[in-house]
Regions:
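Acyl-CoA thioester-binding alpha/beta core of soluble enzymes
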Residues: 1-45, 55-58, 91, 96, ...
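The feature captures the short pre-catalytic strand/loop hairpin that immediately precedes
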Residues: 154-170, 540-554, 749-750
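Conserved anion/nucleotide-ligand pocket segment
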Residues: 166-220, 552-606
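A structured beta-alpha segment of the ubiquitous adenosine-cofactor-binding alpha/beta core
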Residues: 3-4, 15-18, 59-121, 297, ...
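Mobile, glycine-enriched helix-loop/loop "lid" segments at the mouths of ligand-binding/catalytic clefts
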Residues: 46-61, 150-157, 432-448, 536-542, ...
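N-terminal Rossmann-like NAD(P) cofactor-binding subdomain of oxidoreductases
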Residues: 83, 99-158, 469, 488-544
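Conserved beta-strand scaffold positions in the cores of enzyme catalytic domains, especially
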Residues: 37, 76-78, 128, 202-204, ...
């Protein structure tokens, strides 16, 4: 008899009351890690069972490939909350569960006769994750919304695109995947806290707030530092034509920009300081873009990749559902797996040394597992013993040595800090975190004015150590010796070059968990390539479904925080493994793999149905009509999106469109999608004479998703965010009182304001850490400072 495989979350019981994408993705992550997940479905089942983006006709009773990807390995039971006995069954199952995920909207459980507080009374350690567009409370909490209208409300749509053309939203319903990812780590937080305290709680996740963290590049912080509105733009360079296709470039740093200009033979542009500022490149778009494309068309994609690799300029081929599985890097890393349904899907987006993700399970038909699920009710609920920890926050008592830079890594440790961990950020005065310099502000201490650095580094202490110096490296090793977690996000070659490979870290501290987040992983032909979020968006397919029909555009940064949240999830698995074995291990979360996981629909559609999904501005397969509509005020657009039959009927009634309401061809989503442009033209004619506020009031009252498409720098003031206390004001040593976005979940047992301190200045805690904790003598401290091993100002300024 085969030995039972133990996974990190073996033994966890989770109820999934969710449908579509967000909630099912959250619970899918737990399935991959070994949890038992029971999917509770309404009559008719999850609508995603019958959905394909290419409008395929599925066999009777068959579940769509995307549904299978999200729900394989879960047990299905049909329980209708309108039925008293079914409501009782749901409550009895909740009494035996560790976590419940639900997405029925603000007050949705209560409206269906279900009482989450009664569930907590019956099962005091239960974590209830409530996922909704705006959150459970606040003046907007019951406004209809979806991914498209939420994107518009964050301010992320208005600034994406060419100034002479219309703004475009990100494709692929990426906001739903973002919401699901943050729901998963909110579930982790509630569950770990319950294990430490014995107290369960409700985690109220706002998809809107999660999308603010992921889509806006901290635009509200930018508005505080620079003022004014943000112009619509695209990245230069980004996705450019080659002799045989397209290629994706990314020049985040000044060095990458000048090297790129030299590579294309435009030393004149490289030497023009005006173009070090990306805003000036956009202002001279025709000249700069023309110069770039004149050069890029002269070589093949492969030739440009080879040149960029030599110069360490982030580069990638452009991926889509058809090309991704055939890329050499994806093949070598086995990034895609064959599902039982016969299509290809991304593997779980994490790798641990101690275990593999659970094998892909089969997909249950609706109510297929009813008998097995109800058998659970024959046994009395068992409450596990409490392992009292260092506090109620889930990562309290853990020390993190943070070697990361830019966004994905620092935001990972920011989440850990918010949720209780002690984080020591390590920089050097020779090479501070490069994100410190991503700012248009030019003053004597500009490195303390980067809005993204501020956004991803609250709650940390900062020490500077020169790692190519024996003394600096020695001090870092002492910190590692006392750490629970060490984390870095450079390409695979960087840490070993400093003498900090996995074996060295293990030798310093056998219990340390070494989290590594290179763009493309620790193996494969691309492992030494540098890469940022835009690079990952270009290759993963996210850019392929975003933009104009003739021009794919990057989503702008979303892959960084997505990678961060997945890294927190993966780290939680390693912590469970350490409880079992007493040992740390390497945790690998290649930034590209969470992106592949949330862009999965493209590879799934291509492999299952032979259809390569594309892009067409704001027209997307899941909604019709959908678009940004002009109002009578200039630049005050309204985002409107119809995804359900009920919303369609409400729109027809509001517009007095009896012909639409009675049309047989428009009675289905497929029919409406076929008539999309004509529908949008009529909605546009209705909206254009009215004010934005008038339109929003009518649509929201009618139950049609709609939001103002605000400027990226106009998020605040916002009555919903104020009511939810989403922003936390902290007094920074340089920028003064500054408004910071917080974690997008309101926990019933945690403080809402989770940032323990403002972001640190460079080397702010050198004395506190080196002298106070490592007991470096005063004369030695002075010598290190004199030698440039430590310091508080960049050595090159």
């Amino acid at each position: 008899m085969a030995e039972e495989v133990i996974h990190p979350f073996s033994g966890l019981l989770i109820l999934d009351l969710c449908s579509e994408i967000a909630g099912p993705y959250a619970s899918k992550l737990f399935v991959d890690a070994g949890a038992r997940v029971i999917k509770i479905e309404p009559r008719g089942g999850d609508p995603l069972r019958r959905w394909t983006a290419s409008f395929q006709k599925l066999e009777e009773g068959a579940s769509s490939p995307l549904y299978q990807y999200l729900n394989a390995g879960k047990e299905s039971i049909l329980l209708d909350p309108r039925d008293a006995q079914d409501r009782a069954h749901i409550a009895e199952l909740a009494a035996r569960a560790d976590l419940v995920f639900e997405d029925w909207g603000a007050g949705g459980l209560e409206e269906r006769g279900l009482d989450p507080n009664a569930w907590l009374k019956a099962n005091p350690r239960l974590g209830i994750v409530r996922l909704s567009p705006w959150g459970q409370e606040g003046p907007w909490s019951r406004f209809p919304a979806n991914d498209f209208t939420l994107q518009a409300a964050t301010g992320s749509v208005d600034y994406r695109g060419l100034p002479e053309r219309y703004p475009v939203a990100a494709g692929g319903r990426i906001g739903d995947w973002v919401g699901g990812t943050f729901a998963a780590i909110s579930g982790i937080a509630a569950w770990r806290s319950a294990c430490q305290t014995g107290d369960g709680q409700i985690a109220d996740v706002s998809i809107f707030e999660a999308m603010i963290q992921c889509f806006t590049i901290f635009g509200d912080m930018g508005s505080q530092f620079t003022g004014g509105l943000l112009d619509r733009s695209i990245e230069i360079p980004s996705i450019e034509p080659t002799k045989d296709g397209h290629i994706g470039f990314c020049t985040i740093t000044g060095q990458q920009w000048t090297d790129f200009c030299s590579m294309i033979g435009r030393q004149d542009i490289a030497e023009n300081e005006r173009y070090m500022d990306a805003r000036n490149r956009m202002a001279d778009f025709e000249f700069i873009s023309g110069a770039i494309q004149e050069a890029t068309r002269e070589k093949t994609t492969a030739e440009w990749v080879e040149l960029c690799e030599m110069l360490r300029i982030p580069v990638t081929p452009i991926g889509n559902g058809g090309t991704l599985p055939a890329m050499d890097h994806m093949i070598e890393r086995e990034a895609f797996q064959l599902a039982p349904g016969g299509f290809h899907q991304p593997r779980a987006p994490w790798r641990l040394e101690s275990c593999q993700p659970r094998e892909i399970g089969t997909t249950s038909a609706l109510d297929e597992d009813r008998a097995e699920v109800l058998d659970l009710l024959d046994d009395e609920p068992v409450q596990p013993e409490v392992d009292f920890g260092d506090g109620d926050l889930p990562f309290a008592g853990l020390r993190v040595v943070d070697l990361t830079a830019f966004w994905a890594g620092p935001y990972t440790t920011s989440i850990l800090s918010d949720l209780g961990a002690e984080v020591i950020k390590v920089e050097s005065i020779q090479r501070p975190d490069g994100m410190r310099f991503a700012t248009p502000i030019r003053n004597e201490i500009l490195w303390e004015w980067s809005h993204v650095f501020h956004g991803v580094n609250p709650g940390k202490r900062d020490v500077t150590l020169r790692l190519d110096d024996e003394d600096g490296l020695g001090l870092l090793k002492r910190l590692i010796g006392e750490a629970d977690i060490v984390i870095e996000n450079f390409s695979a070659r960087v840490m070993p070059a400093f003498g900090l490979d996995a074996e060295t870290v293990r030798g310093l501290n056998s219990r340390a968990i070494f989290v590594r987040m290179p763009a493309f992983g620790l193996s494969g032909p691309w492992k030494d390539r540098a890469g940022f979020a835009m690079t990952v968006e270009q290759v993963s397919g996210l850019a392929w479904v975003t933009g104009y029909e003739d021009l794919p555009l990057v989503v702008r940064g979303v892959c960084d925080p997505l990678g961060s949240a997945h890294a927190v999830f993966a780290l939680s698995l390693a912590l469970e493994e350490r409880e079992r074995t007493g040992l740390g291990q390497v945790v690998e979360v290649a930034l590209v793999e969470p992106a592949l996981a949330v862009a999965a629909e493209q590879v799934i559609e291509a492999s299952a149905h032979g259809v390569v999904l594309g892009r067409d501005g704001n027209r997307m397969p899941h909604a019709a009509p959908q678009g940004l509509f002009e109002t009578r005020e200039a630049d005050e657009r309204v985002a409107i999106s119809v995804t359900t039959d009920a919303e369609w009927k409400s729109l027809c009634a509001l517009l007095g469109a009896d012909d639409w309401r009675l049309s047989e061809s428009l009675s289905t989503h497929a029919g409406r999608y076929a008539a999309h442009d004509a529908l949008c033209a009529r909605v546009s004619a209705w909206a254009r004479p009215q004010s934005r506020d008038e339109i929003l009031e009518q649509l929201r009252s009618a139950g049609v998703p709609a939001s103002a498409a605000i400027n990226n720098h106009a998020l605040w003031p916002n009555e919903q965010l104020k009511a939810r206390r989403f922003f936390q004001t902290l007094d920074h040593p340089v920028t003064g009182k500054t408004r910071y976005p917080s974690f997008p979940t309101a926990f019933s047992h945690f403080e809402r304001e989770l940032h323990s301190s403002p972001p640190p200045t460079l080397g702010q805690h050198n004395r506190e850490i080196l002298q106070g904790e490592l007991e470096v003598p005063e004369d030695e401290y002075d010598r290190l400072e004199e030698a440039g091993v430590i310091g508080t100002r960049p050595s090159f300024i």
